[in-house]
């Protein structure tokens, strides 16, 4: 994203709107999300799946130590695209809020409410001087009470929206196009996972292949209501079905 000289006076302070109604620091935060590794989520009647891509910036990087899908509580998880350090802070906050809700009310936190709490923090960092917006978008998904699948995405601006399928990061546009052509709500859990993996595969360059070491997959099915991450062996097995 590039701005002309006339815009430069408005991108120095986060609290100043440009004449066209933009907050340029928030727009820049969206650019950080677009540079992140591809991350996506899918919701069907069977449940919710979150998939995060892992890439080696250098051959010396141990990608096995990198997490892209996180468990927030027994019934909900998340993934992100953008600045990893910003994502870590928000994930820790979401976990603490989910735990606090369980301790006080003795029940799992509502996923919409948890997403709102995270989004409120993001929004707060768009209207105060001396801070910057979070350069990260989170996809949050799981099973709410009543066996209701939920999938939401939070933006750097603090806005959050529910989705049937959503993709962010470098391959977000391509994966979204794949979802628009192939999404069906009546898929079973295995086919929901396969849909997400195929959407991620559609973002690869010619000659590239998905491997169990460069993706993370988490899912929650309506039968168990539990969010869990797939093991290396499970990822290897599901990739063989592509």
UniProtKB/Swiss-Prot annotation:
Activity regulation (UniProt): The formation of the proteasomal ATPase PAN-20S proteasome complex, via the docking of the C-termini of PAN into the intersubunit pockets in the alpha-rings, triggers opening of the gate for substrate entry. Interconversion between the open-gate and close-gate conformations leads to a dynamic regulation of the 20S proteasome proteolysis activity.
Q: Where in the cell is it found?
A: Cytoplasm
InterPro entries attached here?
Ntn_hydrolases_N (IPR029055), Proteasome_alpha (IPR050115), Proteasome_alpha-type (IPR023332), Proteasome_asu_arc (IPR019982), Proteasome_asu_N (IPR000426), Proteasome_sua/b (IPR001353)
Record Gene3D superfamilies: Glutamine Phosphoribosylpyrophosphate, subunit 1, domain 1
Sorted alphabetically, the Gene Ontology BP terms of this entry are:
proteasomal protein catabolic process; ubiquitin-dependent protein catabolic process
- Return the CDD domains for the record: proteasome_alpha_archeal
Protein keywords = Cytoplasm, Proteasome
GO CC terms, sorted: cytoplasm; proteasome core complex, alpha-subunit complex
Q: Which GO terms describe its molecular function?
A: threonine-type endopeptidase activity
Cytoplasm: present as a keyword of the record? yes
Q: What are the TM regions of this chain, as residue ranges?
A: none
Q: Which cysteines are joined by disulfide bonds?
A: none
User: Which PANTHER family does the UniProt record give?
Assistant: PROTEASOME SUBUNIT ALPHA/BETA
What job does this protein perform?
A: Component of the proteasome core, a large protease complex with broad specificity involved in protein degradation.
The record's note on quaternary structure and interaction partners says: The 20S proteasome core is composed of 14 alpha and 14 beta subunits that assemble into four stacked heptameric rings, resulting in a barrel-shaped structure. The two inner rings, each composed of seven catalytic beta subunits, are sandwiched by two outer rings, each composed of seven alpha subunits. The catalytic chamber with the active sites is on the inside of the barrel. Has a gated structure, the ends of the cylinder being occluded by the N-termini of the alpha-subunits. Is capped at one or both ends by the proteasome regulatory ATPase, PAN.
Identify its protein family. Answer: Belongs to the peptidase T1A family.
Name of the protein described by the UniProt record: Proteasome subunit alpha
Q: Which organism is it from?
A: Sulfurisphaera tokodaii (strain DSM 16993 / JCM 10545 / NBRC 100140 / 7) (Sulfolobus tokodaii)
Q: Organism classification, top ranks?
A: Archaea, Thermoproteota, Thermoprotei, Sulfolobales, Sulfolobaceae
Record gene name: psmA
């Amino acid at each position: 994203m590039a701005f002309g000289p006339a815009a430069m006076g408005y991108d120095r302070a986060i609290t100043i709107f440009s004449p066209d109604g933009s907050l340029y620091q928030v727009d820049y935060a969206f650019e950080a999300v677009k540079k992140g590794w591809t991350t996506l989520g899918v919701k069907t009647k069977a449940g919710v799946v979150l998939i995060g891509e892992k890439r080696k910036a250098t051959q010396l990087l141990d990608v096995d130590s990198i997490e892209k899908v996180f468990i927030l509580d027994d019934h909900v998880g998340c993934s992100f695209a953008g600045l990893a350090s910003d994502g870590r802070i928000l994930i820790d906050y979401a976990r603490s809020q989910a735990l606090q809700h369980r301790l006080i009310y003795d029940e799992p936190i509502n996923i919409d409410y948890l997403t709102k709490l995270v989004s409120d923090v993001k929004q707060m960092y768009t209207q105060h001087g001396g801070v910057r917006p979070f350069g990260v978008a989170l996809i949050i998904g799981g099973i709410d009470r009543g066996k209701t699948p939920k999938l939401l995405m939070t933006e750097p601006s603090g806005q959050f929206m529910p989705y049937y399928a959503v993709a962010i990061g470098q391959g977000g546009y391509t994966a979204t196009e794949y979802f628009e052509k192939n999404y069906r709500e009546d898929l079973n859990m295995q086919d929901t996972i396969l849909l997400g993996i195929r959407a991620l595969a559609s973002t690869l360059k010619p000659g590239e292949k998905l491997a169990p070491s460069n993706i993370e997959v988490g899912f929650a099915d309506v039968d168990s209501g539990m969010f869990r991450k797939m093991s290396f062996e499970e990822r290897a097995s599901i990739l063989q079905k592509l």
